[in-house]
Amino acid sequence: MSISVVILAAGQGTRMKSSTPKVLHTISGKPMLFHAIDAAKEISDDITVILHHQEERIQKEVEAEYENIIFHRQDAKNFPGTGGAMKGVYTRHERTLILNGDMPLIKKSSLEALTSGDADINMSIIRLEDPSGYGRVIIEDDKVVEIVEQKDCNEAQLCTQTVNAGIYAVDTALLERYIPLLRNDNAQKEYYLTDIVKMAVDEGRTVHPVYVEEEEFKGVNSKLDLARAEEIMQRRIKEALMMAGVTMCLPETIYIDCRATFEGECELENGVRIQGAAQLVNTHIKAHSVIEDSYLKNSDVGPMGRVRPGSKLVDTHIGNFVEVKKSDLNGVKAGHLSYIGDAQIGEGSNIGAGVITCNYDGKNKFRTIIGKNVFVGSDTQLVAPVCIEDDVIIAAGTTVNKDVEKGVLAISRTPMRTVKNFFYKFFGDK
């Protein structure tokens, strides 16, 4: 059966208390809406996103990441509510799945369950130990027969633990017939998507309950919800990676972006952050180090090292308090307290403690090129643009501000001198 997906993302999300649209708040490095789109793309090639609040901003970000997404603007002034969002929406396939853009935790398996079978409507249902505050979904003989608001429940209905999770898979022809019939004769003057369930039941149509996990279908409406969803997503990511062979020390202290990838034997120590689309191959990241959007192979970083976006490290050791930015290091050792930015460093080179690439003049960034087997002594400043050829020794404390040819010693120290008895002249006799 072919499936179309409609994602509701028009809401303002006032409870977020943020100028950022609710659906663009990130979970594990990716906007919530993108998680919903990713899930939808696993089952459908016809995806429509419903927008209203900050629609241009959201559409621009989605189009930068995805192709062939259809956008529909909700006329929220005349047709508010979830049902109003569907006014004027048309989909290609025989069945339409309606998702919420603020549910980033839904899995493919749940969407497949919701879109299987031949019921006119499949309705997501959660069982809650304490359903207080929720309307109850009344189910008889494995069919939904009624949705009752809590204030209207009788004593028996109040004991019902089944509630609406808010996701529906509907026969498209039926949906297109029901949506124009929706009315807003309620206290909020909104058009509710739940009314299509009542229409179907009244017509004797089959509304099938699909039981789902609360964890997956929990909407994110506040910063507290966002933090809780992040915890769940992080747990999933790390459990999957550990099952695939990644070693983690105190995984609850580690953060991993959902776009990061790992190959071979990788180890992450406590407090590590892997951000962006980082790629790690046979690499050891030591405690409290940060890796951002970079490629690392057969390397180790830290403790307390930082590799910033655009870097490539192969067979390289980056030690404590070393920062690397947009640099290509192959077979390099940089053990302590250095900044390497916009650099290319060749095999066998050693970067001493306190070495700095001076890559920025206040207006522009410049490159530092270091060849193979170069020894850069401690407290050296490399003033870019500069090129150091192979087999060079840079003496400690040198400021390199011009190119260095192969095989030489570069040194720029002033001669040391001593002043006799200066201590006693300065402090007096002790």
Curated annotation (Swiss-Prot):
Mg(2+) binds at residues 102, 221. This is Bifunctional protein GlmU. Residues 224-244 are annotated as: Linker. It catalyses: alpha-D-glucosamine 1-phosphate + acetyl-CoA = N-acetyl-alpha-D-glucosamine 1-phosphate + CoA + H(+); N-acetyl-alpha-D-glucosamine 1-phosphate + UTP + H(+) = UDP-N-acetyl-alpha-D-glucosamine + diphosphate. UDP-N-acetyl-alpha-D-glucosamine binds at residues 8-11, 22, 81-82, 135, 149, 164, 221, 308, 325, 339, 350. GO terms for cellular component: cytoplasm; membrane. The active site is at 336 (proton acceptor). Coiled coil: none annotated. It is found in: Cytoplasm. Keywords: Acyltransferase, Cell shape, Cell wall biogenesis/degradation, Cytoplasm, Magnesium, Metal-binding, Multifunctional enzyme, Nucleotidyltransferase, Peptidoglycan synthesis, Repeat, Transferase. Pfam families: Hexapep, NTP_transf_3. The lineage of its organism: Bacteria, Pseudomonadati, Campylobacterota, Epsilonproteobacteria, Campylobacterales. It comes from the Bacteria. Its cofactor is Mg(2+).
